[in-house]
UniProtKB/Swiss-Prot annotation:
Keywords: Amino-acid biosynthesis, ATP-binding, Kinase, Methionine biosynthesis, Nucleotide-binding, Transferase. This is Methylthioribose kinase. It holds the Pfam family APH. It is an enzyme of class 2 (transferase). It comes from Pectobacterium atrosepticum (strain SCRI 1043 / ATCC BAA-672) (Erwinia carotovora subsp. atroseptica).
């Protein structure tokens, strides 16, 4: 019989007292439910002074934004905790600390990050964290390299692929990224004024063939343990610091998916800034986003190549020059996946405030059309975008 029950605020406080690692657990007295995502309950556990000390996160057995009509496995809580613990082995400085997790209750206690801010919110208001892109590139390099065939023994890797099999959450990604936006589906959400633009995408056979190839790679390439949902809303930043959270979509998949999703969210902000800020501030912010993209990729690729020189355990993959060839394919994948992220965040189920918070209707529609056009371009032109300089040139040429 399952021990699972949905936590109340009082349950969360009591759980944090037991498992939060606080020196004086009796000082934990209140819980504030802060979850604004689609899948979980999230509580800030506060002491008598009102200071948040730890976070208690519990998976719900359904998609929160839809309700019980869309059930979900609770095993995703185990996968999230084990993904974060695995990533923390190789990049502790940029992975949220998991203090305790219980698969039966689908609950996890993790460090409080109240001194950090959600990166997406900071980007939307025009704030700059100049080290964040390099730190994210470091996180991606360390976690993807050390969970790949370059580092893991084949037996260990095959066991890990099984351990992190995540079919229900992967199905959500498969549908929301690669299927729903290109058909008439009830989950899609977009302004009626975009209907002609959406229909143009759905009628574009070349685009849909390219998206089919991306979906096939997502389904079949078990290259490394991905975060699986690495967007600017799952990243916390502070002065000189960055922490990645929310890894319930973790699974073994193509490295380019994590990288492309991260780049895609920087481009969503790039496209939205003209509708969010005054012209001069928007122009400056856009230049920073392009520099962030350059820094992210250059940091990732340089670190990955360095690790392949120093830590590769597979003799065949250690052959001089192979890692660089491999990264060329990762880059190609990343550009394509980036394009699908742009499209699905504009006309699919899960939108972003980088676009939706633009108050003026015409400005918002212009930014959304820019995103759709750029997303299509990246999906189709990925084989011809050889490096990050070529990507940034394409973005600059995309207008708006």
């Amino acid at each position: 019989m399952s021990l699972y029950r949905t936590f109340t605020a009082d349950d969360a406080v009591e759980y944090a007292r037991q498992y939060g690692g606080v020196s004086q657990p009796q000082t934990l007295v209140t819980a504030e439910e802060i979850g604004d995502g689609n899948l979980n309950l999230v509580f800030k556990i506060k002491d008598e002074a009102g200071i948040s000390r730890v976070i208690v996160k519990q998976a719900l057995p359904y998609v929160r934004c839809v309700g019980e009509s869309w059930p979900l496995t609770l095993d995703r809580a185990r996968i999230e905790a084990e993904t974060l613990l695995t990533h923390a082995r190789f990049c502790p400085q940029h992975t949220v600390t998991v203090l305790y997790h219980d698969p039966e209750l689908a609950v996890m206690v993790q460090e409080d990050l109240s001194d950090h801010r959600i990166w997406r919110s900071e980007l939307v208001r025009g704030a700059d964290y100049p080290q964040a892109a390099a730190q994210l590139g470091e996180y991606l390099a360390q976690t993807l390299f050390h969970t790949s065939d370059f580092y893991q023994h084949p037996h260990e890797k095959k066991a890990a692929v099984s351990q992190f099999t995540n079919p229900e959450l992967c199905e959500i990604t498969e549908d929301l990224f690669f299927t729903d936006p290109y058909i008439d589906h009830e989950r899609n959400q977009f302004d009626a004024a975009l209907t002609p633009d959406v229909q143009t995408l759905r009628d574009d056979r070349a685009l849909k063939l390219a998206v089919a190839g991306l979906k096939h790679r997502f389904l079949s390439k078990a290259e490394a343990l991905l975060h699986g949902d690495i967007h600017s809303g799952s990243i916390f930043v502070a002065e000189g610091r960055l922490k990645v959270i929310d890894a319930e979509f973790g699974f073994y998949g193509p490295m380019g998916f994590d990288i492309g999703t991260a780049i895609g969210n920087l481009l969503l902000n790039y496209c939205g800034l003209p509708g969010l800020l005054a012209p001069r501030e928007a122009a400056a912010g856009r230049e920073r986003r392009l520099e962030d993209i350059r820094t992210l990729w250059q940091t990732f690729s340089a670190r990955f190549l360095a690790l392949s020189e120093s830590d590769c355990r597979e003799p065949a993959l250690a052959e001089s020059g192979y890692a660089a060839l491999f990264l060329q394919q990762v880059w190609l994948d990343a550009i394509g996946f980036c394009g699908t992220e742009l499209i699905r965040r504009t006309i699919g189920l899960a939108h972003v405030v980088d676009l939706d918070s633009i108050q003026e209707t015409d400005a918002r529609l212009a930014c959304q059309r820019h995103v759709l056009s750029l997303g299509r371009t990246l999906v189709l032109a990925a084989p011809h975008i050889a490096d990050v300089d070529a990507l940034l040139a394409r973005v600059r040429q995309s207008g708006a």
